[in-house]
Amino acid sequence: MLEGVIRESITKANAKALKKDGYLIANVYGKGIENVNGAFKLNPFIKYLKEKKHLIFPVKLGDKTFEVVVQEYQKNPVTNELIHVDLLAVTKGVKSKFKVPVKHQGTPVGLKNKGILMLSKKRISVECAPEHLPDHYLVDVAPLDVNESILVRDLEKHENVKILDHDSIAVIGVIKAK
């Protein structure tokens, strides 16, 4: 479980001092809970996110424990370093909006025909309760030839999960190389 500290002061000077000490500024919020301003050690946070298996993960700030999902993050445009993260605290049975990653498997037929695989939608917007949240959408791209694509409507349907993206949006496809 990730452990962080609660920020007593939310001033700019306090945030700069925490960043200088190697902390990542975080906000935890959700339906029915009071917003919590916190900070996590940057390197352990990144390592934990890379190793986690599910979108929802536990964090501890002070004496409070939350089940959270990364809602949004900000990176420094020059150094590409993570500088801020918003964590949505989820409650069982309460519907929320999430962004679920798209993963692909297989080698498209179109690559042999001078095509290029284009992942046009990396995340799918969904609405559901946290207990029904899929960890990812897995797409088999092996049958795709040049100028073919997989649309949102072609994705696997999960029970109690409503996809918010329009049906006709391309998720992944093979385009002709120039």
Swiss-Prot record:
- State the source organism's domain of life: Bacteria
Q: Tell me the Gene Ontology biological-process terms attached to this UniProt entry.
A: translation
Gene3D superfamilies this protein is in? Answer: Ribosomal protein L25, beta domain, Ribosomal Protein L25, Chain P
Q: What keywords tag this UniProt record?
A: Ribonucleoprotein, Ribosomal protein, RNA-binding, rRNA-binding
**Which Pfam families is this protein grouped with?**
Ribosomal_L25p, Ribosomal_TL5_C
InterPro entries per the record? Rbsml_bL25/Gln-tRNA_synth_N, Ribosomal_bL25/Gln-tRNA_synth, Ribosomal_bL25_b-dom, Ribosomal_bL25_C, Ribosomal_bL25_long, Ribosomal_L25_dom, Ribosomal_uL5_bac-type
* SUPFAM superfamilies attached to this UniProt entry: Ribosomal protein L25-like
This protein's record includes keyword Ion transport: no
Q: Name one GO cellular component term.
A: cytosolic large ribosomal subunit
Gene Ontology molecular function, alphabetical: 5S rRNA binding; structural constituent of ribosome
For this chain, the family text in UniProt reads:
Belongs to the bacterial ribosomal protein bL25 family. CTC subfamily.
Q: Which PANTHER family match?
A: RIBOSOMAL PROTEIN L25/GLN-TRNA SYNTHETASE, ANTI-CODON-BINDING DOMAIN-CONTAINING PROTEIN (PTHR33284), RIBOSOMAL PROTEIN L25_GLN-TRNA SYNTHETASE, ANTI-CODON-BINDING DOMAIN-CONTAINING PROTEIN (PTHR33284:SF1)
The record describes its quaternary structure and partners as: Part of the 50S ribosomal subunit; part of the 5S rRNA/L5/L18/L25 subcomplex. Contacts the 5S rRNA. Binds to the 5S rRNA independently of L5 and L18.
Q: What is this protein for, i.e. what is its function?
A: This is one of the proteins that binds to the 5S RNA in the ribosome where it forms part of the central protuberance.
What name appears for this protein in its UniProt entry?
Answer: Large ribosomal subunit protein bL25
Source organism per UniProt: Helicobacter pylori (strain HPAG1)
Q: Which gene encodes it?
A: rplY
